[in-house]
């Protein structure tokens, strides 16, 4: 326990903030190539087959990214753009793939929250 005089002289060091998306290196998005596209099962109270892809980024990192929406056209060697954002019931999945960018098609039938899924405006 420091004395008051020690605190006045040196102060306290603030706790370092942990980076939740280290592979992005401060960038809003990063480009990468899918090395594997597969499904995983979520944590305990939930049950599903969630679609994920292992992506090798341009900076050399290899990360697991979630593929949002119903249905996708991704396969090995597809070029994708990823953003930060974890999936709460999939441990180790801390990134999302952006729909409607590069090799990833947007959703056709989407009416609401279209910008998240790369969907065109319906006529």
From Swiss-Prot:
Alphabetized Pfam families for the sequence: Ribosom_S12_S23
Modified residues (3-methylthioaspartic acid): 89
GO cellular component: small ribosomal subunit
Swiss-Prot/TrEMBL GO biological process terms: translation
GO molecular function: rRNA binding; structural constituent of ribosome; tRNA binding
Cited InterPro entries: NA-bd_OB-fold (IPR012340), Ribosomal_uS12 (IPR006032), Ribosomal_uS12_bac (IPR005679)
Keyword terms, alphabetized: Methylation, Ribonucleoprotein, Ribosomal protein, RNA-binding, rRNA-binding, tRNA-binding
Annotated family: Belongs to the universal ribosomal protein uS12 family.
UniProt subunit comment: Part of the 30S ribosomal subunit. Contacts proteins S8 and S17. May interact with IF1 in the 30S initiation complex.
HAMAP family: Ribosomal_uS12_B
Function: With S4 and S5 plays an important role in translational accuracy.
Protein name as it appears in the record: Small ribosomal subunit protein uS12
Organism: Gluconobacter oxydans (strain 621H) (Gluconobacter suboxydans)
Primary gene name: rpsL
